[in-house]
């Protein structure tokens, strides 16, 4: 009781060209729908999904990633992180996944 059920979905990284070096790391069950949600909140439509990976327990994985990256957080509530480059973000997301999961998930990479 009280345990959150596992849910598969996508861990994604979103950028906004107005804020270089800032990236949002979140989860969704539908990548295209998630991007549309962001675009409606921006008159310039300048959000871009930079990276995503499927995960069998995306909410737990996201929580672990956020915990490991908390020193880069700009505001934990909205999941934005200030980090040097997109590749650094992707590397940290990949590193935070357990090795056995990463082997299986490499098949789902963009």
Regions found by a protein language model. Name each.
Residues 1-110:
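Non-catalytic accessory segments flanking enzymatic or RNA/DNA-binding domains
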